[in-house]
Amino acid sequence: MKRIMNLYESCKTPIRVAYFGFVLIAIGFLIQNESVNVFYTFRSNIILFIAELFLRIGEFMIMNLPIIFMLNIVCKRANNASPVVMALVGYFTFVVTTMLFSNQSLNAQAYSTGFGINSVFNYSSGTRLPLETGMIGSFLVAYATRAAFIFSRHRRDYSITNVLSKDTAGIIYNFVFCFVLGIIVSYTFPSAYTYLQRAITFIGADLFDPFRIGVYSVLDRILSICGMNNIIRYPFWYTSAGGSFANTVTGQNVLGDVNIWTYLKDSSSTYFGAGRFITPFYVINMFIIPGFYLGTLFSMSDKSDRNSLIPLFIFAIILSFVAGNPLPCEFVMLFTSPFLLIAYLILVGVVSGTLVNFEAFLGFSSKITNTVIAMPGSFADFIINIRNASLIRSVNTILIAGVICFVLMLVITMFYYRYIAFDFVRTGKGAQVIDDIIEIAGGINNIDRAGSGLFKLNIYIRDPEKISFEKIQEIGIRRVVETKNGLSFELGTSSCAIAQRINRRLRA
């Protein structure tokens, strides 16, 4: 748990950037959204310009999240500015290496067009592009940079640090490390991509099979976290893998789930099943994610901490409704409670299959064609679809499934924080941590009560003079803060369970 919280601390700022980026995108999206324009149309050029500005800035933030994560990790871990330069050199070395060494015969979604890096060297078929490695590539480079930084700080016989400065040596080491990583990824990525293509073929073989749609939804969320969801979204949203619709009157053939939904929305034609790949997002954004937020909030037993965070959680829930993208919340789950992320993915897969089984289909249309920052399943799209009489059955099914998923996610989250998070891997250290905390506080009789905040344990002390500060150094808890009422321990998601057990001892 300590390692998980250390990683969370390293990634806390990029997660905030993700939230802020989607706030900007949501503002721009709402102003330009056709669903909102049904109720009110913004005609001011200034407002439309601001919307476009926010949309593009937010898009740039989200598209470059892997680099932001990488830079923040190397800064936090090294507590030094020089790793930033090392990381950038290493990242571009890694990217260029994947461009020159990788197989260029994969689908276009397997390659990245970021930063405009390309090459026509020794490639007769066209331009070579780097592989789209997303978060995986950025984390590989981050830890390669960390290793290079540490390696450059140790002087050895015949080491280049005896000739060059430590920072220069670190850059050279990282160049070599990232070059090797780039070659390894160049030859292993196509194999992994082949399996993804098989999954896409498997899903596309029967677009009405609940299991296949469930697999799609789980893969979509996993690849979104990895920053690579365009690999699976583009084929189903915009190509024949997501279905096709032929207008017998005009002879027009429309490909892809999102394209079909958009076309049907603007015409009088009908097509059963359009929106199947978008429908689960309404449940995710409006019910499952709020269930996680409220479950986390209700798990805090310290009223002062809980009350101070209520506005923040309300804002996060509103953002989930409006922005229609669960990615920031999924980052929080990944870096604080992987168990909850797994439970969340299972729930997403099950509800996706269930919606198809009950023939509930509800799509979305948007001017945003970038699948990475697309916001399907927003409240604005949901409201506008309620007005369509032919969609009432789908809307009602989504509401029923959503309420059930909300309750399930709420219960799972609270159960995890209160019971499972305590000594999750069953190392036997959970009880020892409680004993150590009681000893630090000066004994059980010196504790008035215990309460849990967001990833922290608050111990209210009767006599501050009895606190054993020497013991804090011995047990190696990541962070302990002395407050006006006692001590605050940063214990991660196990804080709630530990607070409950300490209070039980106080009542015994």
Enumerate the predicted regions with their spans.
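Early transmembrane hairpin of solute transport permeases
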Residues: R3-Y158, S165, T336-G349, G353-F358, ...
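Hydrophobic alpha-helical transmembrane segments
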Residues: L53-I67, N122-L140, R212-W237, G256-I289, ...
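Membrane-interfacial loop-to-helix junctions in multi-pass transporters
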Residues: I46-I47, M63, E132-I136, K166-I172, ...
